[in-house]
Amino acid sequence: MELQMTAPCLLGLEGLVAEELRQMDAREVTAENGRVFFNGDQAMLARANINSRFAERILIVLDRFTAVTFEELFQAVRRLPWSEFIGSTDTFPVKGYSISSTLHSVPDCQKIIKKAVVESLKEDYHINWFDETGPVHQIQFSILKDQVTIMLDTTGTGLHKRGYRPESNAAPIRETLAAALCSLSRLRHYHTLYDPFCGSGTILIEGSMLAANVAPGINRNFACDRWGFVPEAAWKQERARAHECIKTDIDFQAFGSDLDPHAIELTAINAKRARVGQYLHLDTADIADFNPQTERGTLVTNPPYGERMLDIREAEWLYRIMGEKFNPRKGWSYGVISPDEQFEKCFGRKADKRRKLYNGMIKCQFYMYFK
């Protein structure tokens, strides 16, 4: 079955998501703000869930239409082939949002969509009551300037939940963003990665998984596992393919340090859970003592800053030390994510390249130095 799907993502990562989907052989890939649309079959759906490093989830797009009245919304939703996805005992909650639209009340839209789905299923299953005790089929809707998109969430718990980080430090970076920073830094399997503010190890772990080509979702489950819509053989085949693509004989190392001994302990535990502990070298150390011993290195880091853990004055003092330690040298690149507009001034050098990204709700710049 040919499906249209969409992969929501953090703002600024649309290009990375589109490119990884193309590499997975997705068809008709098009990027919009905060999401990427693509086409494929059920195997592609499984492949995207298992392999995407940068998307937040994978949704099936059931329809896109214009609606300015509740009747138009009801009839358009009712016409959709819900019984192809939702069984007679399955659970189907509804959530979504409305922006700059005539139908602006989200609770009212939820009720109308739920009612329309129920009426459609009543006709197909010839029953009047749904216990909703079976697998969850999360229905999502978006209404933007009267344009409605109706979707089914196939992922469940967000794709950033890889399963290796049940514990984290006070200000963790999102896994999808950490993977993106490593990719934007052009990290390769023969590089040496550094993070002198490693926290609970997310950048080091995501970098190691990227270098070894370990699929982020290879060891987790998804909402649509229990639907039966994707054949079990497709899941087995896609997981087997992901295992075959893992690189085991690579010349890769990742060095991490942090001032907090507990953070180093967390990093070691999380790396072991992610099965990349063999690549990591960890130490409790201050940034003032940063003194790498390798000739080449790719440094990617998310230092503490005013809106997270330090006040602005402390953060800018930290940036000055970083500027002294991260000096230009052949074979080295440095990537620092920060929301501080004064970062370059404090660091002492203009970035060779900048990219606007969001760390949670905080607007940041990813400052890249490679010359």
Provide a role label for each language-model segment.
Residues 2-135:
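Non-catalytic nucleic-acid substrate-recognition regions in nucleic-acid-modifying enzymes
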Residues 99-102, 158, 304-308:
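A short, flexible beta-alpha/helix-coil linker loop
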Residues 173-292, 307-308, 312-314:
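Conserved S-adenosyl-L-methionine
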